[in-house]
């Protein structure tokens, strides 16, 4: 399963959070849960550079801190990373 679905856009997520929460969080939760139930062999999730928040570096690195996104969009993408990590550990869903 490759999940590229999301409502994108940093600015709009601040003024209109509803669709971001519904699609990026609830929708993601539904997809990963169904992937587990249907015994999907591998789950791939496309996150976003928005999880790096206010990082001022020109090139982000995987070791950079990603716990302070500056938009709701970035927060939903980071939340999904954590959910995917937990599904991988709790239910042995390869991610």
Identify the residue ranges that each predicted region occupies.
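SDR active-site strand-loop-helix element
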Residues: 1-5, 43-49
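NAD(P)H-binding glycine-rich loop region in Rossmannoid oxidoreductase-like domains
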Residues: 1-23
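Catalytic helix-loop patch of NAD(P)-dependent Rossmann-fold dehydrogenases
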Residues: 15-33, 37, 41-42, 51-95
């Amino acid at each position: 399963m490759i999940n590229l679905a999301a409502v994108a856009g940093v600015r709009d997520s601040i003024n209109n959070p509803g669709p971001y929460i519904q699609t990026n969080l609830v929708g993601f939760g539904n997809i990963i849960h169904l992937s587990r139930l249907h015994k999907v062999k591998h789950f791939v999730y496309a996150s976003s550079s928005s999880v790096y928040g206010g990082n001022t570096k020109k090139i982000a690195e995987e070791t950079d801190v990603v716990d302070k996104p500056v938009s709701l969009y970035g927060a939903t993408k980071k939340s999904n990373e954590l959910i995917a990590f937990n599904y991988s550990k709790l239910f042995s869903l390869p991610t």
